[in-house]
């Protein structure tokens, strides 16, 4: 089985409690990102094997395993697991590293 990292999306950021996104829940924002990756790549949601989300500050609405909650909000099947990685400012990079080390491909062939 080949592992394929087919796409990624990043949520916008803004000053706390200000701007057009101030009232949007973080799990909703991440769910929209997941939907966009599925749309861009024309994926069948049932073909998604995993969702790994980097979250610098998992508190409030984003403190309840935002990777799992967002995947469900995005309409992925409940059989698709979701995971949240917290390494503060390095959360997104750690999520990519986690993906690479949990994929079935040999580590020495990663380019």
Regions flagged by a language model, labelled:
Residues 63, 82-91:
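Active-site nucleophile and cofactor-binding loops and adjacent substrate-binding regions
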